[in-house]
């Protein structure tokens, strides 16, 4: 059953998603990680729970609700050499899998649902550094296209990052380097 590398990666992604979803599924984000969970004002089965592990600098606004979480199954951050070094921003190219099916993440940064073709583009609002890897981010959505998975998304977190750091050392101007990375993306609606 898990005889191929692809099958093992999928199994690992599913296990990782289960953990992420257990941590954030059906909760409302609170501004302080020290707050005690309290019953929600709406819905008998809803709960307000502090979501641990999100640095204060990259938390979405209080009242934001998670609508989906996705794990990078294959991804790269591509850097272009300028002035003999790989500096500046990177261009993402990744495949994600999660609560709303499969998602393509690409330059923009943009995310497009492969299930319903809904599309969002966002801009970086804040970042939180992580040693030896690309930073965790909070992004604010600035464009929506289509109805569906991403129709109500207002914020995106890039969390639990690994890899993706620009290569060190000299390079030839114009050369590119695609560096593998991993992350969990959490999509949030704004408080209504």
Go through each PLM region and give its residues.
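Secretory targeting and sorting signals
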Residues: 1-34
């Amino acid at each position: 059953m898990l005889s191929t590398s692809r099958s093992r990666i999928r199994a690992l992604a599913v296990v990782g998603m289960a953990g992420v979803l257990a941590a954030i599924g059906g909760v409302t984000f609170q501004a302080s990680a020290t707050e005690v969970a309290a019953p929600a004002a709406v819905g008998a089965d809803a709960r307000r729970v502090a979501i641990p592990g999100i640095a204060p600098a990259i938390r979405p606004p209080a009242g934001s609700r998670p609508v989906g979480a996705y794990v990078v199954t294959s991804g790269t951050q591509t850097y272009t050499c300028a002035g003999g070094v790989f500096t500046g921003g990177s261009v993402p190219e990744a495949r994600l899998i999660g609560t709303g099916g499969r998602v393509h993440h690409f330059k923009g940064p943009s995310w497009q649902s492969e299930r319903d073709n809904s599309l969002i583009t966002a801009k970086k609002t804040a970042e939180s550094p992580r040693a030896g890897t690309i930073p965790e981010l909070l992004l604010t959505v600035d464009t929506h296209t289509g109805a569906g998975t991403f129709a109500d998304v207002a914020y995106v977190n890039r969390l639990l990052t690994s890899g993706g750091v620009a290569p060190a050392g000299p390079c030839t101007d114009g050369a590119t380097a695609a560096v593998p990375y991993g992350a969990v993306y959490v999509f949030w609606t704004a408080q209504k």
